[in-house]
Amino acid sequence: MVRFEFTDSADKHGIPHPDAEHAVMHHVEYEILQPRRTGEQSFMFVGLPHPQALRYLEVGVAVDGRGRRIIFHAMEVTDLYRH
C-alpha cells in the first residue's frame, strides 16, 4: 500500500485526504514539475476524488530522496491543468 504524508498547505482548500489519495492513485493525467527542494521530484496529478465524482482534483506530490510521498497541494482542478 502506498502511503502519503500531507503538508499543511495540502489542506488549504479543504480536500479530504482520502479524496486526494484516490485522485493520485487513479489519475488520468500528470505533469512533472520543477522540484520544490534539492533531491525531490515533484508531480501534479489530475484525477477524480472517487469513482462517482464529476469534478477532477489537481494534487501536487513530492517524492523525497527516501521515497516518502508528500502531498503539498490539493484542490479542484484549475484551467492550468484542465486539458
Model-derived features: where do they sit?
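Ribonuclease/tRNase effector modules and their secretory precursors
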Residues: 1-83
